[in-house]
């Protein structure tokens, strides 16, 4: 097969070489770094639902999303450092930023990530074309299984509800100082009757 000597062909070959030799290793290292550092350091947020959404829900989480984007084709590689910078910009550039700004910023990043998750699913569904089925690779088979399971359980609606609930709490929650972030949360309803029972037992004795 003769190489394409046109300008577009040269640009394609240069971009593919840079992707394989430079951008792909950087994206993998960046994914590992964000997955390690990001999970070990808590986010500057008070909403517990958002932490669960970011750190435990793998289908809708930002940190595994960097790894998912790492195995994309050449078009999606530049999104990884861009999202990493956008996600950590308030903490790196201005650590003393107001909580309201950080909350609205994270809500915007969550909205962007939701669209990219949609692009991710659309991309792997596009690979179902017969042209791509003659060389299925393990990541494709794994993500095909995850997408089919997600569509079967209808998790997209659930994810949208979780996202709307978390964004609503972030946007309309009262803004406090940093000491409120480390303050213990209010006791749940299941704990209150137990404390009342203990008080009554002590008073009777």
Swiss-Prot record:
This is Uncharacterized mitochondrial protein AtMg01260. It is found in: Mitochondrion membrane. Its main location: mitochondrion. The chain crosses the membrane at residues 18-38, 69-89, 106-126, 127-147. A stretch of 270 kb of the mitochondrial genome is duplicated within the centromere of chromosome 2 resulting in the duplication of the gene. The expression of the duplicated gene is not demonstrated. It comes from Arabidopsis thaliana (Mouse-ear cress). The keyword Nucleotide-binding does not apply. It is a multi-pass membrane protein. Keywords: Membrane, Mitochondrion, Transmembrane, Transmembrane helix. One of its GO terms (cellular component) is mitochondrial membrane.
């Amino acid at each position: 097969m003769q190489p394409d000597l046109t300008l577009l062909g040269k640009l394609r070959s240069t971009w593919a070489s840079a992707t394989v030799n430079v951008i792909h290793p950087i994206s993998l290292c960046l994914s590992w770094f964000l997955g390690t550092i990001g999970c070990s350091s808590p986010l500057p947020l008070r909403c517990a639902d958002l932490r669960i959404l970011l750190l435990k829900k793998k289908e809708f989480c930002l940190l595994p999303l960097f790894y998912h984007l790492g195995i994309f084709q050449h078009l999606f590689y530049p999104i990884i450092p861009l999202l990493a910078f956008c996600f950590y910009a308030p903490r790196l550039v201005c650590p003393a930023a107001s909580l309201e700004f950080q909350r609205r910023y994270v809500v915007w990043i969550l909205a962007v990530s939701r669209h990219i998750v949609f692009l991710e699913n659309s991309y792997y569904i596009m690979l179902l074309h017969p042209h791509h089925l003659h060389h299925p690779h393990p990541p494709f088979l794994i993500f095909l299984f995850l997408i089919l399971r997600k569509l079967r359980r209808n998790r997209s609606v659930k994810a949208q509800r979780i996202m709307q609930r978390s964004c609503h709490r972030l946007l309309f929650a009262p803004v406090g100082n940093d000491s409120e972030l480390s303050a213990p949360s209010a006791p749940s309803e299941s704990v209150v009757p137990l404390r009342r029972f203990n008080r009554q037992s002590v008073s009777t004795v």
